[in-house]
Amino acid sequence: MASSGAGDPLDSKRGEAPFAQRIDPTREKLTPEQLHSMRQAELAQWQKVLPRRRTRNIVTGLGIGALVLAIYGYTFYSISQERFLDELEDEAKAARARALARASGS
């Protein structure tokens, strides 16, 4: 078999496509065509990932909002319970005072 060249889309030995070569644009001078190609690839990747990221952000925001509302609601509930318990305690004190008054008055 002939060895795979630069234009060969598949590696004939392993049947795999070649990976893109990683470059550092700050060290290597790139042509405008290469820069344009890089921007197009980045834009395509960003547009491909954007809907999934947006969905995750919405779900995360709704989850955090639900947690905040739950804490807020529980705070109101616990404060109303404390007020209710304070009223019961006041009634119990009044009942004890009446009982003491009856006991001392008899």
Swiss-Prot record:
Membrane-topology descriptor: Single-pass membrane protein
Keyword Membrane: yes
Pfam families reported for this sequence: Coa3_cc
Keywords: Acetylation, Coiled coil, Membrane, Mitochondrion, Mitochondrion inner membrane, Primary mitochondrial disease, Transmembrane, Transmembrane helix
Side of membrane Mitochondrial matrix, spans: 2-57
One cellular-component annotation, GO: mitochondrial inner membrane
Mitochondrial intermembrane side: 79-106
Region Disordered: start-end pairs: 1-34
Major location category of this protein: mitochondrion
GO BP terms: mitochondrial cytochrome c oxidase assembly; positive regulation of mitochondrial translation
Coiled-coil boundaries: 78-104
Function: Core component of the MITRAC (mitochondrial translation regulation assembly intermediate of cytochrome c oxidase complex) complex, that regulates cytochrome c oxidase assembly. MITRAC complexes regulate both translation of mitochondrial encoded components and assembly of nuclear-encoded components imported in mitochondrion. Required for efficient translation of MT-CO1 and mitochondrial respiratory chain complex IV assembly.
Sequence similarity: Belongs to the COA3 family.
Illness association: Mitochondrial complex IV deficiency, nuclear type 14: An autosomal recessive mitochondrial disorder with onset in early childhood. MC4DN14 is characterized by developmental delay, cognitive impairment, motor delay, abnormal gait, sensorimotor demyelinating polyneuropathy, exercise intolerance, obesity, and short stature. Serum lactate levels are marginally increased. Patient tissues show decreased levels and activity of mitochondrial respiratory complex IV.
Protein name, entry field: Cytochrome c oxidase assembly factor 3 homolog, mitochondrial
Protein source organism: Homo sapiens (Human)
